[in-house]
């Protein structure tokens, strides 16, 4: 490990075998607010770091993650030298190497039907894997941590990265509470969908028809309905039970959608009410979106 001060910028170099989970690792770091770049030529590493850190106005990223693979690289053995240059520039550098058994890599390529980066050399898949192990040996020797992903699925790998590298924002889950009108379709991005059409409809009250579910008159009307109170109690219990289980680091965003006929009264009321409840329960990153109104 380098001796840079704790306040120094951080650079994570992600290397390893194709099919071992490097892309998952980079996406995990990106979700934790790292500035990420994939497939960077290794000889450009010092200039890349210097250019990013050249801004002295506070806009330069302090946490970087760079993916390196074997394509077009003839000088992987120089990683140690370029790493030292970055360290001398005041950057805290850590090299991660991801690998997996031949059997695991073969199965992953069979499942995804993607081509191995070295297949362009006319090698069979087993030959390409063996050749890549030889080419990446210098990276493996330089690694601060070697992570074998043979028995890990995507979610397990993401959780391991977050846990082992103590990422600052590991527990932050972004919650979006959205309202919509069923007549325009269910939002494709929704993780949970709740139907508010079973509740009393303020539309049939002439004094409330022109208002939205964000306004006091509609809120008072709905809160006075026993069915609404029962619905809220069950809804709150459900979300309080299951949202924390999604905040274990395997997810970054969750959208909870509420639908009614016009997307104006009941669905808006529920989205606003549950967003308020989420903030009261300690969730920090909470937003609302009213599709038919915003």
Swiss-Prot record:
Alphabetized Pfam families for the sequence: PapZ_C (PF22740), RapZ-like_N (PF03668)
Keyword Amino-acid biosynthesis attached: no
Superkingdom of origin organism: Bacteria
InterPro entries referenced in this protein's UniProt entry, alphabetically: P-loop_NTPase, RapZ-like, RapZ-like_N, RapZ_C
Annotated ATP binding sites: 16-23
Matching Gene3D superfamilies: P-loop containing nucleotide triphosphate hydrolases
Binding site for GTP: 69-72
Recorded GO MF terms: ATP binding; GTP binding
Keyword ATP-binding applies: yes
Keyword annotations of the record: ATP-binding, GTP-binding, Nucleotide-binding
HAMAP family (UniProt xref): RapZ_like
NCBIfam families: PRK05416.1
Family recorded in the similarity comment: Belongs to the RapZ-like family.
Role played: Displays ATPase and GTPase activities.
UniProt protein name: Nucleotide-binding protein Smal_0950
Organism: Stenotrophomonas maltophilia (strain R551-3)
